[in-house]
Amino acid sequence: MTGKQKLELILSGGVPDTPPHWELVFQIQKEMFGMDRSAVAKEDRPAFDLDVLHRVVDEFGWAAVRGGYDVAEIKRTKDSLGSKALVPAYEGDGVFWMPTGENMVDFAVRLYERMDELQAEARAKCDRAKEFFPQAVDAGADFFVVTYDFGYNDAPFISPEHFGQLVVPYLTEIVETIHDLDRKVILHSDGCIRVLLDQIHATGIDGYQSVDPQGHMDIEQVRRDYPDWILMGNVACNMLQDADEASIRTSVRNCMTHGGVGKRYIFSTSNCIFAGMPPESYRIMLDEYRRIVAECETSSPE
């Protein structure tokens, strides 16, 4: 099976013999391919970005490629790559998530003193997202990734009680809307969200990407607690920054074991292929993944 076929099987409720691989973002095209986006004229960058995505599918076997947050980008990507990779649409503003530094104090004050005001904003956010989803499907989106960072490294951005009031009802609506469009949806969230997972799982969302080791998230425990979930992650990005071969290979084996082989799992980093990652780190990560896949395929009965 191709990576695309494996991912299609997972999204339809099945389990491939070995997990597919893709990443939410790829930002080392210059280091890996010699392709310098900063040297490309603005009007030529959409075509440049598609060329990069073709390279990652052809050379790394990605099962999906970023469709983006914009309907035009989703359509452009689907038209160019839809025959060889799935194209998810991204949405990042449908619910409240971790506020930026300059807004943090104001958000905290409103959370305790003006909850009605926040609820009105939450309603508007959700409604805008629900308008976007059918447009994205019409543009060719095969599934959705909602990018809502709910956690800092040591704790969620709000208490479980406030999360249940301010996020869960709207996230549930978002999931229901996407399911009504016959699409699946995966949550991307960095950080420590252990105390939120029961509430997130109860929304009906289909999967969870990141399972962030820097946020003290244990993929073995998450898999044990939510065996039906599609999990995606969680090779530690801080480890990839350091290019420590033994540590990277150990992290890959942990992901493939517990994520993992024989389960509804997508192999990836705990975030993305970020700018500044040494290309050798990604090569090591892929090499160990491919070695495990080859071992599984060799040992499988005919």
What is each of the regions a protein language model found here?
Residues 1-51, 62-302:
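Active-site loop segments of alpha/beta catalytic cores
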Residues 56-61:
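Short, intrinsically disordered low-complexity segments
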